[in-house]
């Protein structure tokens, strides 16, 4: 049994003919229902008599259980009923040839009612099918019921078939069907409801259906689109009385439908009721149906459990699908946040690797010697560079040149220094590239035989090294600022309720020291002076470019004015004796005053 019924290929005449056939079917059902109601009334009266006779068992031994006539030998002998076990007279019972015994008239009527109401059949069919029959057709053609014969058919269908709201139908489809004109032949895919099965499969009385019918009669009068007659309300009055009487007694002929009846009235069902009702009386229709559903809920609590196994769960499936969709959207948002966190962790790991590399390559040997006494590759490179600088210093100090030659050397050395220092401020912001360039420049051989190297003084070599260290330190500080920014973002994510997994490597901080301005040494002291501290000239400091330029210009002007400038003692004291105690781990952290003047 499909959930949708496509009747778009039917013309209006064919649809009207189908509706007339369904209307005749409803009329026959109503007549049969009235007949069965009369039989049920008789059965109820007989049951009350039996209850009285069951209390007085000795009375049934002498009198008939139905007509209360005394038994007579050969004229009115007593016979026991095979159904109830009571004794009746010959006129109040009949022979059952298949069972080879007597059955009293009340038990025979009960069997007739059960066969006429098809309870013996629908108790098994309801567990297999949920919707079929003429009610399915009438629901599919609901859009065409807005015409002449529509209201009467709707009222009959509501009284005989529909006593529940839509469980798994789509409310939008019925709204489209109501909006279409009568002559429209567009395709209509209308939903089929759970309660379609009830009216088509049940010919017995249903009090909740009649209450729904009564609530729909005044609404049809109020609606401007409907043409009603007084016969519907007149027929509904006896149905209401019979339905209330049957609900109080709970007769055996009245059966309920456990699989279609809900245990509670949800807001979605009220919405479906509002769409099924005409515009004039939607509230009255919804209230009547809600009252009918309340009575059905009370009756369904006493049903066997095997009938509750095939309940239509389409509403639950739609709700579950909606919940799953919301879960998927939340999961997608959580996945995007997790991907951002993963990218941040990768960035942090990369920055930590760069910091580790810079600490291994840029940290002076003094800091490493204090932390660990093991000599590393950086110590070996620093020592080799120191030896080369000593050779250069000795070669330059041995040459005695005039002031003109020294001026020419200074003029040649100044563009060389600009070339070596100029590109450094424009270096790539990537820390790894700057560190690679620094290592490559430190490892480049400085041959004393090179004429360009002769023109460069020892102070220029030292200033170049200071520039490299300063640039590297600034890049390390920039990397640390990026790390702090990332940590602040992670803290914000954690404050928002997201969990951030730390990276595999522990967080390390840079051990780079903060360099102070370099010391050139006092001019009044010689390196061999006992007051001069060799360890005070050990640190290489970051000097700004403008100060370095001013320092070189002052040296050049002093060379011009005074020829008695002793270069050998001053420069050799600042370069060749660079922290001799660094390898022993006994370096002092005192610094000399930055005095730049020559002896007059």
Curated annotation (Swiss-Prot):
It holds the Pfam family Rab_eff_C. Changing residue 24 to A: Decreases RAB27A binding. GO terms for cellular component: cortical actin cytoskeleton; cytosol; dendrite; extracellular exosome; perinuclear region of cytoplasm. Keywords: Coiled coil, Cytoplasm, Disease variant, Metal-binding, Repeat, Zinc, Zinc-finger. A zinc finger (FYVE-type) spans 64-107. Residues 373-496 form a coiled coil. Changing residue 14 to A: Abolishes RAB27A binding. Gene3D superfamilies: Zinc/RING finger domain, C3HC4 (zinc finger). GO terms for molecular function: actin binding; myosin binding; protein-macromolecule adaptor activity; small GTPase binding; zinc ion binding. Changing residue 32 to A: Abolishes RAB27A binding. InterPro entries: FYVE_2 (IPR041282), Intracell_Transport_Effector (IPR051745), Melanophilin_FYVE-rel_dom (IPR037442), Myrip/Melanophilin (IPR006788), Rab_BD (IPR010911), Znf_FYVE_PHD (IPR011011), Znf_RING/FYVE/PHD (IPR013083). Residues 146-277, 390-465, 499-541, 553-600 are annotated as: Disordered. Residues 4-124 form the RabBD domain. It is found in: Cytoplasm. Residues 232-243, 409-420, 558-569 have a biased composition (Basic and acidic residues). GO terms for biological process: intracellular protein transport; melanosome transport. Binds RAB27A that has been activated by GTP-binding via its N-terminus. Binds MYO5A via its C-terminal coiled coil domain. Rab effector protein involved in melanosome transport. Serves as link between melanosome-bound RAB27A and the motor protein MYO5A. It is linked to Griscelli syndrome 3: Rare autosomal recessive disorder characterized by pigmentary dilution of the skin and hair, the presence of large clumps of pigment in hair shafts, and an accumulation of melanosomes in melanocytes, without other clinical manifestations. This is Melanophilin. It comes from Homo sapiens. The gene is MLPH.
